[in-house]
Swiss-Prot record:
This is Pantothenate kinase. SUPFAM superfamilies: P-loop containing nucleoside triphosphate hydrolases. It comes from Streptococcus pyogenes serotype M3 (strain ATCC BAA-595 / MGAS315). It catalyses: (R)-pantothenate + ATP = (R)-4'-phosphopantothenate + ADP + H(+). The keyword Cytoplasm applies.
Length: 306
């Protein structure tokens, strides 16, 4: 792995946790459980060892951003314009992006109690299923061409310029964009942007999404481990879908366990693994920080861009 990250400094978990003075986790076990995704695994010790030092590092980047903005305003002889601090979080399906994003949102809210900390997922910028069907792209859902990148870039541009912005809302229960529903963002102090595609931009050579980020994180793991987590999550989703006939996954909920596993493994290999290897993992080096997970979901190595 180290050969792939020649512009990164490798930091062990043991070394990383010393970069923050021991403190309380800033949240309870119940709160941590409520923000942990299906089949993810995170403990209070992980919060203290990994995420509190990360919050410190984000603060370093935020101060640097503010100092640069101030220096630019002096140079240009203009009033300083405070801009949202945008954090991009990427990685494979089922690697734990959502848990990390929600945890960072909560910790930033606790460490910056007077700041507005918002979270948006790029799922909302997928084209609606009907459009994907009309374009023959439904089986490419999640691949770069299934996202409305122009809309996503316009959203980020509005956010960065301090304007009110609106994002479509995606529901995993119906596997589609929710019609006529928007999430509004009114000049937040922090915005976390989470999605498999946050370092990609296949449709627009003008700029990348990452051009808008002040800090960025890639969640990394061996693909064989992610496959296991994906299958485990799929089985958990089916268990929940049995109670809701309107859930998209209810159609698979009655499958025998062996067939459900075979179905999930096929989806992983033909869709998610291909997407990971061709489009997601190659963008990994655009991140400022890479968090590597071992088979038990624990972060064992950290890579910080030099």
């Amino acid at each position: 792995m180290s050969n792939k990250f020649i512009n990164f400094e490798k930091i062990s978990r043991e070394s990383w946790k010393t970069l923050h003075q021991k403190a309380k986790a800033l949240l309870t076990q119940e709160e941590l459980k409520s923000i942990t995704s299906l089949n993810d695994n995170i403990s209070i010790n992980d919060v203290i060892d990994i995420y509190l030092p990360l919050i410190n590092l984000i603060q370093v980047y935020k101060i640097a951003q503010e100092n640069l903005s101030f220096s630019k305003s002096l140079f240009l002889k203009k009033d300083i314009q405070l801009r949202p601090f945008i954090i991009g979080i990427s990685g494979s399906v089922a690697v734990g992006k959502s848990t990390t994003s929600r945890l960072l949102q909560l910790l930033l809210s606790r460490t910056h109690p007077n700041s507005q900390v918002e979270l948006v997922t790029t799922d909302g910028f997928l084209y609606p299923n009907q459009f994907l069907i009309e374009q023959g792209l439904l089986n490419r859902k999640g691949f770069p061409e299934s996202y409305n990148m122009e809309l996503l870039l316009d959203f980020l541009d509005s956010i960065k310029n301090g304007q009110t912005a609106f994002a479509p809302v995606y529901s995993h229960d119906i596997y589609d964009i929710i019609p006529n529903q928007k999430q509004s963002f009114n000049n937040p102090d922090f915005l976390i942007v989470e999605g498999i595609n946050v370092f990609q931009n296949q449709q627009n050579n003008r700029l990348y999404m990452s051009d808008y980020f002040d800090f960025s994180i890639y969640i990394d793991a061996d693909s064989s481990h992610i496959e296991t987590w994906y299958i485990e999550r799929f089985l958990s989703i089916l268990k929940l879908a049995k109670r809701d006939p309107h859930n998209y996954y209810a159609q698979y909920a009655q499958l025998p366990r062996s067939e459900a596993i075979a179905f999930a493994r096929n989806v992983w290999k033909t869709v998610n693994l291909e997407n990971l290897e061709k489009f997601i993992e190659p963008t990994r080096n655009r991140a400022e920080l890479i968090l590597h997970k071992s088979a038990d979901h624990k972060i064992d190595e950290i890579y910080l861009k030099k």
